């Protein structure tokens, strides 16, 4: 294999043909589907009399539309029930495995594929969901695709793609106590912009990245798309291999030994050239919260909402829109902003380590009066593991609701929604206007631990004041 970046190597291994116009037909090693973007794709297959090309490389789950308070069938929402029923019929007809409610394997698509060992280094992964970049944490190249492309992958197990440039995001040092991978990626997006990664794959590297757990790396790669990058990835290493070993779909025995050797060879070579490199100092990254209506409008917890003259000219129109929508004026300290709803979950931060971090803050404390706070595990496996550790009891004792797995309040496709002008402290990935279900609802993105801190204080809070020795 020639030297190069992991992106180059994986691209070359999956290249089928060069297409007219300069794009490449790329083989897809793993296709993940769910109930929202697959129905029209299956209908198109039926209209053309086509079969699913590789059902054994296709895996389904239900996540976006499922209620989290009760998942008894039929769902109260007839549209949600029809969407799941349609997915069930399509999977049965085409021989696609479905990780359904009650199977012990259901959950958010970007949570279950890694925990089942489906996502592996060197793969190309596609899914009709923006945050498919999550799987890059394993040294895979993972793309979110639209419904028409879901159809194409079902029919041909390939995609027409244009090759990206590679930007290395080098993060040196170690993150301070109380600062998480969520803070890191919000910090990166703040400084590079929501369009800064357009045309790029982001390679996350450096000692701070190497020190992250796999679940933290998934958080990082999950939000690469929010910085404009089509995908983000971390080179596979011992952390990757230890996470995968023993999972249901991971290789075993001699096959495992061979796989690890091959996976190791895929990492970016020391002499590889990247198209761009940006360096960050991990020690300088604070707990970070968004104040506006894009993930790039972030602030360190000790900062204030910027004035127009502090911003680049290109950032000013969206800032003015954010001032009006969020009702936050220049000079307002982000710490102390009151919240109404606190949501812990999503494909960004709904994994076991996320719940542990939030529970550490909630333990022995109480949700502030008038605050609605709830925790939604990212999968049935996460819920089971958290309950085995007693995390559900910690949250309930503190006044949080403990819910069933699903996408929940990350987006407005299920009953979990903001009302009116409510402000949410959310561990999800997007703070767009109306994203959480109310046309005027407001979202502040932050880490799960920061959400828990906001819940117990009723306002945006520096979590470091609650986890330091003097606070205990």
UniProtKB/Swiss-Prot annotation:
Per the entry, which co-factors are needed? [4Fe-4S] cluster
Q: Which UniProt keywords apply?
A: 4Fe-4S, Amino-acid biosynthesis, Branched-chain amino acid biosynthesis, Iron, Iron-sulfur, Leucine biosynthesis, Lyase, Metal-binding
The question of whether Iron is a record keyword is answered with yes
Matching entries from InterPro entries are given as: 3-IsopropMal_deHydase_lsu (IPR004430), Acnase/IPM_dHydase_lsu_aba_1/3 (IPR015931), Acoase/IPM_deHydtase_lsu_aba (IPR001030), Aconitase_4Fe-4S_BS (IPR018136), Aconitase_4Fe-4S_dom (IPR036008), IPM_dehydratase_rel_enz (IPR050067), IPMI_cat (IPR033941)
Highest taxon above the source species: Bacteria
Q: In which pathway does it act?
A: Amino-acid biosynthesis; L-leucine biosynthesis; L-leucine from 3-methyl-2-oxobutanoate: step 2/4
The keyword Metal-binding is assigned to this record:
yes
Q: Catalyses which reaction?
A: (2R,3S)-3-isopropylmalate = (2S)-2-isopropylmalate
One example GO MF annotation: metal ion binding
GO BP term, pick one? L-leucine biosynthetic process
The record's function comment reads: Catalyzes the isomerization between 2-isopropylmalate and 3-isopropylmalate, via the formation of 2-isopropylmaleate.
Report quaternary structure and partners.
Heterodimer of LeuC and LeuD.
Q: What is this protein called?
A: 3-isopropylmalate dehydratase large subunit
Q: Which organism is it from?
A: Synechococcus sp. (strain CC9605)
Its lineage reads:
Bacteria, Bacillati, Cyanobacteriota, Cyanophyceae, Synechococcales
């Amino acid at each position: 294999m020639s030297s190069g970046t992991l992106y180059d190597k994986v691209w070359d291994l999956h290249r089928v043909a060069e297409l007219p116009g300069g794009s490449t037909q790329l083989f897809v090693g793993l296709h993940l589907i769910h109930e929202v973007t697959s129905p029209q794709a299956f209908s198109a297959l039926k209209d053309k009399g086509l079969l699913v090309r590789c059902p054994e490389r296709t895996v389904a789950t239900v996540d976006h539309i499922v209620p989290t308070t009760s998942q008894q069938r039929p769902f109260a929402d007839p549209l949600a029930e029809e969407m799941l029923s349609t997915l069930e019929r399509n999977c049965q007809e085409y021989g696609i495995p479905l990780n359904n409610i009650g199977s012990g394997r259901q959950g958010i698509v970007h949570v279950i594929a890694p925990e089942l060992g489906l996502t592996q280094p060197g793969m190309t992964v596609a899914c009709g969901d923006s945050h498919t970049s999550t799987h890059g944490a394993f040294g895979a190249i993972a793309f979110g695709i639209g419904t028409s492309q879901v159809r194409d992958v079902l029919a041909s197990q390939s995609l027409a793609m244009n090759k990206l440039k590679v930007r290395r995001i080098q993060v040196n040092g170690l993150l301070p106590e109380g600062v998480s991978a969520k803070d890191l990626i919000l910090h990166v997006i703040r400084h590079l912009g929501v369009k800064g990664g357009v045309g790029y794959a982001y390679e996350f590297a450096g000692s701070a990245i190497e020190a992250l757990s796999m679940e933290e790396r998934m958080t990082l790669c999950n939000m690469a798309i929010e910085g404009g990058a089509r995908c983000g990835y971390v080179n596979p290493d011992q952390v990757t291999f230890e996470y995968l070993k023993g999972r249901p779909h991971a290789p075993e025995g001699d096959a495992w030994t061979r796989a690890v050797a091959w996976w190791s060879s895929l990492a970016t070579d020391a002499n590889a050239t990247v198209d761009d490199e940006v360096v960050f100092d991990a020690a300088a990254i604070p707990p970070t919260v968004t104040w506006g209506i894009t993930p790039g409008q972030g602030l360190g917890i000790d900062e204030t909402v910027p004035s127009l003259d502090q911003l680049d000219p290109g950032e000013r129109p969206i800032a003015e829109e954010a001032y009006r929508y969020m009702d936050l004026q220049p000079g307002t300290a982000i710490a102390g902003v009151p919240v109404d709803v606190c949501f812990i979950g999503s494909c960004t931060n709904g994994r076991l380590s996320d719940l542990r971090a939030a529970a550490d803050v909630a333990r022995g404390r109480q949700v502030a009066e008038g605050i609605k706070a709830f925790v939604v595990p990212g999968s049935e496996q996460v819920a089971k593991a958290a309950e085995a550790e007693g995390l559900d009891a910690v949250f309930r004792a503190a006044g949080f609701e403990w819910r069933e797995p699903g996408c929940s309040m990350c987006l407005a496709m299920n009953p979990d929604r903001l009302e009116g002008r409510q402000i949410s402290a959310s561990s999800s990935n997007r703070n767009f206007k109306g994203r959480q279900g109310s046309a005027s609802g407001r979202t502040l993105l932050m880490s799960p631990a920061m959400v828990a801190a906001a819940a117990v204080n009723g306002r945006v809070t520096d979590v470091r004041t609650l986890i330091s020795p003097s606070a205990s």
